Amino acid sequence: MDINSLLNIAAAAAKDAGTHLASFHNTRVDKEDGHDIKLRADKEAERVILDRLIPTGITILSEECGLLPAGDSNYYWIVDPLDGSLNYLRELPMCCVSIALWQGEESPVFGVIYDFNHDKLYKGIVGKSATCNGALIHVSTTTEKSKSIITTGFPVYMSHDEEGLARFIRILQDYKKVRLFGSAAMSCAMVAQGSVETYHERNIAWWDVAAGVAITIAAGGRADIEILDKERHLLDVFLSNSIITKD
């Protein structure tokens, strides 16, 4: 398996989808369900990506179409064609295309995130390096939680009852500042490039963070991942600069 060739395919797919999203701002809402929202744009971006990925013969898991089995290898394309759909709908410039290659459910190989609003392409191969538009990026060197920024969010499947919110607040209290960007993938990219020290979300979907996890690890960071619901692909994810700890 030629990882560099596959990375180039993923990067081209992300750029194609992002260019489409940036140039054709179709904001038709196909479905709203509680705290979730689906746009026609998600499906159109996914179609653009699948045209690139299907010929590779690797199984695809995408937020919109679900699982597309291919072959018998243990590799997966993990795709979120538009992460930050509500931001996109409201013209808040914090959304992106996210594509990752994983081996099984526990081993990220590489990730690609395209921030099409700012024309920034993040790439990272685990065990090698991470870049943004070709320039090397690295996680922060901050050593104290009290001087650190954590980014998080309110995932679709998060419990919004009193106990769930209290647990959420307890996690944040030790940090200097909290940022909610409305895009899990972009939050991960912020950790990878050293803009923030940590990212933590519970009940976040695999496709939301798969690329960001790979890029953060490639940039010198650490990922602590717990599978919460295998059928729905829900995780507890804590990314850090490898210095700041979860507890």
List the model feature ranges, each with a label:
Residues 1-14, 18-19, 166-173, 186-247:
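Oxyanion/phosphate-interacting regions
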Residues 1-82:
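N-terminal subdomain of lithium-sensitive/metallo-dependent phosphomonoesterases centered on the IMPase/IPPase/PAP
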